[in-house]
């Protein structure tokens, strides 16, 4: 599953997990 992030690999960014996030916002960020 890490290979799927190869597209974002060009941008070094740490995986951030917000403490409280609405399920609707999560579905919107899941592109």
Curated annotation (Swiss-Prot):
Tissues showing expression: Testis.
Main location: nucleus
Keyword Nucleus attached: yes
GO cellular component, one term: nucleus
Domain of life from the UniProt record: Eukaryota
Region (Disordered): 1-31
UniProt KW keywords: Chromosome, Developmental protein, Differentiation, DNA condensation, DNA-binding, Nucleosome core, Nucleus, Spermatogenesis
Annotated compartments: Nucleus; Chromosome
Its job: Protamines substitute for histones in the chromatin of sperm during the haploid phase of spermatogenesis. They compact sperm DNA into a highly condensed, stable and inactive complex.
Additional comment: Clupeine Z is probably the result of a crossover between the genes for clupeines YI and YII.
Designated name of the protein: Protamine-Z
Organism listed in the record: Clupea harengus
Lineage summary: Eukaryota, Metazoa, Chordata, Craniata, Vertebrata
């Amino acid at each position: 599953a890490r290979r799927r992030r190869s597209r974002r690999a060009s941008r070094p960014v740490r995986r951030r997990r917000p403490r409280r996030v609405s399920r609707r916002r999560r579905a919107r960020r899941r592109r």
